[in-house]
Amino acid sequence: MITIDNYLDSHYIHRSNWLRAAVLGANDGIISISSLAIGVAAASSSREPIILASVAGLVAGALSMAAGEYVSVSSQTDTEKADIEREAKELKEMPVDELNILAQIYERRGLTKETAMQVAIELTEKDALGAHIRDELGINEISQANPIQAAIASGTAFTVGGLFPLLVILFAPVKGMEYWLYGFTILSLIILGVIAAKTGGSSIKKAIIRITIWGTLAMGLSAFVGYLFGIRV
C-alpha cells in the first residue's frame, strides 16, 4: 500500500544534501590529485616527488574538504535556526499579521481568498510555527542541511576519488605519466558522472560532458604550468 511516507522516500530529492557533498568531494579528489601530479610530473624526472606531492595533497585536501563542508553547512544551519527563532518571536508579538501573511502565501499558490484563510487558520491552530517555517521560510526536513553528514560524505569521497590517480602514480611509467594520468582521470570522471546521474536521477550524458570538460581544463592548465617552469626535480 502506498503511503505518503514510503512514496516520498522513493524520490531523489532526499539524497540531494549528501549526494552534492559526495559528488563534489569525489570530483575534487580525482581532479585535484591528478592535476597536482600532472603539474609535478611535467617538471620531474623521478617518481618520488610526484608521490610525495600527491599523498600530501590527498591528506590536506580530504581534511580541507571535510572542514570546509562542515563550516559551510553549519553556517547555513545557524542561519536557519536564527530565522526560526525570529519567526517564533513574531508569532507571539503579531499573530494576526502572521496569519494574514500565511493566508496570502496560499492565495498566491492558487487558493481562493476564503479557502486560503481557512487553511491558514487550521494550520495555525495545529502548528503555527511549523506552518510558517515550511511555507514562509521554505525550510523543511528534506532541505535542512546536516553538517556532520556533509563533512563525512565530502571528506570520504575526496579520499576515495584521490586514491584512483594515486594508483596510476605508483604503477605507471614516469615517462609520459601525464598522459596516463589524463586518460585514467577522464575514465574515472566518466564513471563518477554515471554514478552521480543514476543516483540523482539526472541525465547521464549531461553529467559526463560537464564533468569531463572541467576536468580536462584543470589538468591541461596544471600541465601547462609544469612545462612553463620546466624545472627538473
Could you tell me what each predicted segment is?
Residues M1-H14, V73-G155:
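Cytosol/matrix-facing amphipathic helices and coiled-coil assembly/linker segments
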Residues A223-V233:
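Juxtamembrane boundary at the C-terminal end of a transmembrane helix
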Residues I191-T216:
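Interfacial loop-to-transmembrane junctions
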Residues K175-L187:
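Structural signature of hydrophobic alpha-helical transmembrane segments
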Residues G57-L58, G155, T159, I186, ...:
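Alpha-helical transmembrane spans of integral membrane proteins, capturing the lipid-embedded, hydrophobic core
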Residues A60, S64, G161, P165, ...:
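Alpha-helical transmembrane segments of multipass membrane proteins
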Residues M1-S72:
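Internal alpha-helical transmembrane segments
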Residues W18-A37, E141-L167:
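Transmembrane alpha-helical segments and their cytosolic interface motifs
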